[in-house]
């Protein structure tokens, strides 16, 4: 099956050509050669679910009641993924509320990115059911952003954002570049941009389609600390303005607490920890409540046990939390 026929069947996903994605091994992001394939097949592709709305079986009317998910835009029911004899994900049950922001953390190799690729439908489950529903029950327009911006080096910033949209989309592309603070760089080349600016272009390229679901696969992992904070603020602002559903895979626990309403920990291919984030926005990183929640999640990742038990991490913001703040800020990476 060619990239053209795949696009006709499934529609586009930004930042990833389907033929290249399905053929490549599960390793690092693509480079300019992948970007050339992307341009060849008409730009960034979207990947909504198939017409039935689900992998494995048709969705049932009682799915919402059985899962207790309410208005879920994405639902996985007993989903497993195997590569040969190796099981990467096992019996995953997950419902993502429409308009929510969910972060997935865990050690390297635990299955985080595999779960994201299943939701993107770049891979299919070995067992179980994945259901995606857009507004009104229609197609859930999905875009994905990687750590590698995958910009075409021979096209300007504006042209990169317009990939696959045609000349009539110039006004939309300029508007979204203005939203990410790069309208003044519209006619620059990607090589003239910093790493953070390149990621802003990648974000603009995804958001120009006004997606209902944005998937973020460690998009800020290569950026310096200050640029990461600026990108956190930008992503949160755009999420609040456009109210898309967001699913973030990250190694950085502080990043997960900064952005998400809910944090999932994957261990040995299963969801081992599901933590709400009851902190007001914008998040106060220097607060005791933030530090306590960050420390709780981090310790759960590192030790495999919940130091706070069933008690909400943000319920108490006393002296113990202040004592752990320096530790939480100094050790943020769950790798």
From Swiss-Prot:
Enzyme Commission identifier(s): 7.6.2.14
- Entry-linked InterPro entries: AAA+_ATPase, ABC_transporter-like_ATP-bd, ABC_transporter-like_CS, ABC_transporter_ATP-bind, P-loop_NTPase
Q: Which residues form the ABC transporter domain?
A: 74-293
Top class in the EC scheme:
translocase
Sample GO molecular function, one term: ATP binding
Catalysed reaction(s) here are:
ATP + H2O + aliphatic sulfonate-[sulfonate-binding protein]Side 1 = ADP + phosphate + aliphatic sulfonateSide 2 + [sulfonate-binding protein]Side 1
**Which segments of the protein form a coiled coil according to its record?**
none
Chief location category: membrane
Where does this protein reside within or beyond the cell? Answer: Cell inner membrane
Protein family according to the UniProt entry: Belongs to the ABC transporter superfamily. Aliphatic sulfonates importer (TC 3.A.1.17.2) family.
The record's subunit annotation is: The complex is composed of two ATP-binding proteins (SsuB), two transmembrane proteins (SsuC) and a solute-binding protein (SsuA).
Protein name as it appears in the record: Aliphatic sulfonates import ATP-binding protein SsuB
Per the UniProt record, the source organism is Burkholderia thailandensis (strain ATCC 700388 / DSM 13276 / CCUG 48851 / CIP 106301 / E264)
């Amino acid at each position: 099956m060619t990239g053209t026929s795949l696009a006709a069947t499934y529609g586009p996903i930004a930042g990833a050509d389907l033929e290249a994605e399905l053929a490549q091994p599960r390793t690092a992001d693509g480079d300019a050669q992948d970007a050339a394939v992307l341009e060849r097949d008409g730009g960034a592709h979207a990947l909504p679910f198939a017409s039935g709305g689900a992998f494995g079986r048709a969705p049932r009317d009682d799915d919402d009641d059985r899962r207790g998910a309410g208005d879920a835009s994405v639902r996985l029911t007993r989903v497993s993924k195997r590569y040969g004899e190796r099981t990467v994900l096992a019996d995953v049950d997950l419902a993502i509320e429409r308009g929510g922001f969910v972060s997935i953390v865990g050690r390297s190799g635990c299955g985080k990115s595999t779960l994201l690729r299943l939701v993107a439908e770049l891979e299919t489950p070995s067992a179980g059911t994945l259901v995606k529903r857009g507004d009104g029950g229609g197609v859930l327009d999905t875009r994905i952003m990687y750590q590698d911006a995958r910009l075409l080096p021979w096209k300007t910033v504006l042209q990169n954002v317009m990939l696959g949209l045609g000349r009539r989309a110039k006004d939309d592309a300029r508007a979204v570049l203005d939203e990410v603070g790069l309208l003044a760089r519209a006619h620059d080349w990607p090589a003239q941009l910093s790493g953070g600016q390149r990621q802003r272009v990648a974000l603009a390229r995804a958001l120009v389609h006004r997606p209902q679901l944005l998937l973020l696969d460690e998009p800020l992992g290569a950026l310096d600390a200050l640029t990461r904070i600026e990108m956190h603020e930008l992503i949160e602002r755009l999420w609040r303005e456009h109210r898309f559903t967001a699913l973030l895979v990250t190694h950085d626990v502080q990043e997960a607490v900064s952005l998400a309403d809910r944090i999932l920990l994957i261990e040995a291919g299963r969801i081992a920890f599901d933590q709400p984030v009851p902190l007001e926005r914008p998040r106060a990183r220097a607060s005791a409540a933030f530090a306590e929640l960050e420390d709780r999640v981090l310790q759960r990742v590192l030790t495999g046990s919940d130091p706070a038990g069933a008690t909400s991490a943000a319920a108490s913001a006393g002296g113990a939390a202040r004592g752990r703040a320096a530790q939480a800020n100094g050790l943020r990476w769950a790798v």
